[in-house]
Amino acid sequence: MDVTAWAWASFLAVVLVVLTILRRGRGSQPQGNRLPPGPKPWPVIGNLNLIGALPHRSIHELSKQYGPLMQLRFGSFPVVVGSSAEMARFFLKTHDTVFADRPRTAAGKHTTYNYSDVLWAPYNAHFRRARRLFATELFSAARLESYKHIRHEEVSALLRDLAAAAHGASGRAVPLRGHLFAATNGIISRVVLGKKYAEKEAGGSAAMALEDLSGLIEEFFLLNGVINVGDFIPWFDWLDLQGYVRRMKKYSKKMDRFLEHVLEEHEERRRVKGEQFVARDMVDVLLQLADNPNRLDRDTVKALTQVCMQELIVGGSDTSSVTMEWAMSEVLRNPEVLGKATKELDRVVGRDRMVMEKDIPDLPYIEAIVKEAMRMHPVSPMLAPHLAREDASVDGHDIPAGTLVLVNVWAIGRDPTYWDAPEEFRPERFMGSKIDVKGQDMELLPFGAGRRMCPGYSLGLKVVQLIVANLLHGFTWGLPDGTTMEQLNMEEIYGLTTARKFPLEAVVEPKLQEHVFS
């Protein structure tokens, strides 16, 4: 979600007032230390004046001057940025535990049950327990396999709905974003909650309209991505000058009501089923764990259920659909890629059925398209910020405890040191390559690495690969009339996820046998 103009205006107005009061000269780095190189900060605002609407690009330009390890200040907080695979390895692998903490923000406090989720939780016993729970209970290979039918059913529904939209468009362009979000949200909702709460049931009504759920997700990404003055200039925290904290509290109450509804419904089903109860979704799994008082209490279950909501429904739905929209954008700009993908799909799958998950290992070019999209358009260009838990040093430079650490994976993915012609979309670069997206290859980190790596990456990767494969297999693709490949707008909009600024529209026509779409 883009930072709004009025938010920046209010922020700058506050800064101007403070500068007028203080009338101090520009600051400089403290003497007698070995901090990494970087631009001199201004009083109060630090280097925030150098950060534009696309921070990953602004910071990339600064790193060209100051190097792959750079010191900045955001307000009163020291920030270190790593912009190379070597720095990524240092922060995320070699010294992972040193930099495994998170900064304390108003959004983390008010939108995640006081830092109870895996994303914003400090590195403590709660985080380690939740992380272990994700790995062993929620995202085990067996658990993901048990949800495979859900993924296939929702992808089939996507093909059917997109075919109907194409028929209704009569050769005109079809907006894709809504279809992609509905598909990913349907998968994640059913896996986590057991059903699509934004979908009406027979004889009843939806717990939340799809547009309301979408709005709640947008609000989450806005509030977790804005420049909140109080986070960086603590003097103004209590004033809530921009009104963000008030909105965070309102969001929290709305999410809490929805979450209570989900928990009550699941608990009632357990009560009715009695001994015949069988867990069918991740909330059920969490509630079963709560039966053992030595493992989880209700408050912890509630917090961890919100983890599933916000890090899977909120995060998974949005990040997966954003990645797919970028992938399809690049394919439309590169017809030779579309041609190669079509040949591979026709050879492996044929034209009388949809692509199944079992087909993916036999579709290396499709896998390469997804990797290349993640290289050029990582959904979180600088990952979530890390925080140094203790003093550290790298390449002769000191990083004091309490320093906020950013890893610019967008810059690493565009670095000619690691990639030939990095600005070109070339899936072929991954054909025969062992480079993967699972956090072991520092040149390609769409999900991060180490202890803070996205816990749901395996599910997200399955969803993206399956849907991209079926989109390319099920339809012919073209740009809207009058739009050339060079004219397709590829501008970004920054936030917790960095999406296309303008939603993708394409001319689509079903090309498989009719029964596939029925």
Spans of features found by a protein language model:
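Terminal signal-anchor or tail-anchor transmembrane helices
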Residues: 1-30, 462
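C-terminal helix/juxtamembrane-tail motif
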Residues: 2-4, 496-518
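Cytochrome P450 substrate-recognition site 1
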Residues: 30-48, 57-150, 176, 180, ...
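Conserved cytochrome P450 K-helix E-x-x-R motif and the immediately C-terminal K′/meander segment
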Residues: 48-61, 65-67, 257, 356-396, ...
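Cytochrome P450 heme-binding "Cys pocket" and the immediately downstream C-terminal segment
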Residues: 100, 335-337, 457-497
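Cytochrome P450 heme-thiolate monooxygenase catalytic core
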Residues: 103-111, 145-324, 340, 357-358
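Conserved cytochrome P450 K-helix/beta-meander segment immediately N-terminal to the heme-binding cysteine loop
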Residues: 360, 391, 407-435
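Cytochrome P450 heme-thiolate "Cys pocket" and heme-binding signature region
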Residues: 395, 432-464, 489-494
